[in-house]
Swiss-Prot record:
This is ECF RNA polymerase sigma factor EcfG. SUPFAM superfamilies: Sigma2 domain of RNA polymerase sigma factors, Sigma3 and sigma4 domains of RNA polymerase sigma factors. It comes from Rhodopseudomonas palustris (strain TIE-1). The gene is ecfG. The lineage of its organism: Bacteria, Pseudomonadati, Pseudomonadota, Alphaproteobacteria, Hyphomicrobiales. Keywords: DNA-binding, Sigma factor, Stress response, Transcription, Transcription regulation. One of its GO terms (molecular function) is DNA binding.
Length: 181
């Protein structure tokens, strides 16, 4: 399939969501940017394998996820400030409560198993349907639903959130934890 203007525009429209997903996976904006760039290069190099009429964002997210997993396996042996002592010296004190709440949310999200975090980010934050998230992750729809449910339950417990409380500083956090946005 040739790269049409419409297809190019659709790919470019997916970049912000790809970057957000890459950041949620890697926890590092620079690595996320590298993942997105490599995803776009791979997608363009393999544009002939994209099936017209199928879900372009799901195809792109699948490429990104596979790249992340490959990169993760390579980096698993690297030690990069494992205890965070160096990073703590670089941090400045946040000036707003929302920033503190988001950091607390981010820390809780990082405690989730990788498969649950991926499912939750895809469904809760990126707005993919359970079916699309299952296609991206290469598993059954029921598996995605289970992962999302377990992730939401664990996040709620980690953040001491019950059904009556406000779910966080913004709509994305509320959608991820509460399932509505």
């Amino acid at each position: 399939m040739p790269l049409t203007d419409s297809l190019r525009d659709d790919i470019l429209a997916a970049v912000p969501s790809l970057r957000a997903f890459a950041i949620s996976l890697s926890g590092n904006a620079d690595r996320a940017d590298d993942l997105v760039q490599e995803t776009l290069l791979r997608a363009l190099a393999n544009i002939d394998s994209f099936q017209p009429g199928s879900n372009l964002p799901a195809w792109l997210f699948t490429i990104l996820r596979n790249l992340f997993r490959s990169d993760y396996r390579k980096r698993r042996r690297e030690v990069e400030d494992a205890d965070g002592s160096y990073a703590k010296t670089l941090k400045s004190q946040p000036g707003q409560t929302a920033h503190l709440e988001f950091e607390e949310f981010r820390a809780a999200l990082d405690k989730l198993p990788q498969d649950q975090r991926e499912a939750l980010i895809l469904v809760g934050a990126s707005g993919f349907s359970y079916e699309d998230a299952a296609a991206i992750c290469g598993c059954a729809v029921g598996t995605i639903k289970s992962r999302v449910n377990r992730a939401r339950s664990k996040l709620s417990a980690l953040l001491y959130v019950d059904g009556a409380e406000d779910f966080g500083p913004d709509d994305t956090v509320r959608a991820v934890i509460g399932g509505n946005g």
